[in-house]
Amino acid sequence: NDEIIQEVKKVATDSQKGTYHIKKSKLSTIGALLPETATLKTSATPKAAFNKSKAIEYAKNWATKYNPQYPKYSSGDCANFASQIKLAGGTKMTHASSGNVKKGWWYLRTTRGTSNSWRLARDFTRYFGRSTYTGSSFKTFSSKITAGRFIGYDTTKDGDVDHIGFVTAKNNKLKTTEGVTYYNFKVAQHSGMYHAWVSSKDNGWDALHKKYPKISY
């Protein structure tokens, strides 16, 4: 109807300014015309394009050591490192005015504080979203990977990502190790700090299916 058309036009105009204002009651009517994130208010500053080259450069430099400018988490540093890569690639932080750790994506150098989305794999993925592929085939998963992409896995298929890595290189050569065949790719990550090809003994992505029978990527 005319009301829906006007709402869609209004969002199309305001989205260029970084503001989405559609009411939840409208979403069920408009359906697939709008993304679910249309219920969120974003920064009025247009998003900068993600610079994969700078992100890859940062990942290579800091995969095997901690950057003293950031906090570190000995119990699990993968998302913290992924966030640093995102920042190096030009993604802008979104601060919560109240310092609410459940909102935004940010860290504070002075207090070493962070949002949950900065340091937890589950919340990082919920904040930035997932790709369209989820499945248990490591070969299919590897075929869709490209350099400059974040990757993750869910060990129990409960819908929450448990670990995040970052791809710095990819080739089209099929490898078979640890009982799985895949297209080889190179991962930079923390929580197991390395920068290595999956086929390398230093990288454990090829053996995950043995440790986690219900794993999905």
Task: List each model region and its residues.
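Active-site scaffold segments
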Residues: 79-87, 164-168, 187
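Low-complexity, Gly/Ser/Thr/Pro-rich intrinsically disordered linker/tail segments
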Residues: 180-194, 199-217
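...with weaker cross-activation on analogous glycine-rich loops/strands in unrelated enzymes
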Residues: 106-185
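Ordered hydrophobic segments in well-structured contexts
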Residues: 19-21, 69, 150, 164-166, ...
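Non-catalytic propeptide/linker segments at domain boundaries
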Residues: 1-49
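Secreted/periplasmic proteins that engage bacterial cell-wall peptidoglycan
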Residues: 56-140
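Short, solvent-exposed loop/turn and secondary-structure capping segments
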Residues: 94-98, 163-164, 199
